[in-house]
């Protein structure tokens, strides 16, 4: 979909002297990322084949290993050069019905027997632990740092349906307002220095970059 250079956030940050890195622990040709990322202004792109020694959860590189990669990039950057890293994780990608030798779901919902729901919630907890690791690291960093954490979409209906059923609903009986909620995702903007605290603000992912720069 992107075939020419665009004035995206990495382009702007590069003009300010930032090193700009895109990292995605999956195949480089997915959605033509290896071609698109440079057009968006990233000076370096890192894909699955460069996640040497990474840990896996199910069949995907773990979020914990993604955090390790971000920290590695930060620690090896040239001193005094600011760094922008855009990391698209894979750990929690669907589907959620298969079984794996390296992952045992350990979260359940009372009154619900659902492998997809249990698997998804257990994966989210691992993501939460990885985020804690990332935040804890940059809390101690001397350089001012902002972390933006968000998802691109909610899990599929195999995960949502059991919760809806528990509340007497199905995916087909949702009102228009309820259906809209299926297309909302939470986000967090955190910094290791004082910024204006705000909660409950609805926005579009299109505007997250502007919010961070504000």
Identify the role of each PLM range.
Residues 1-214:
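Solvent-exposed soluble domains appended to multi-pass membrane proteins
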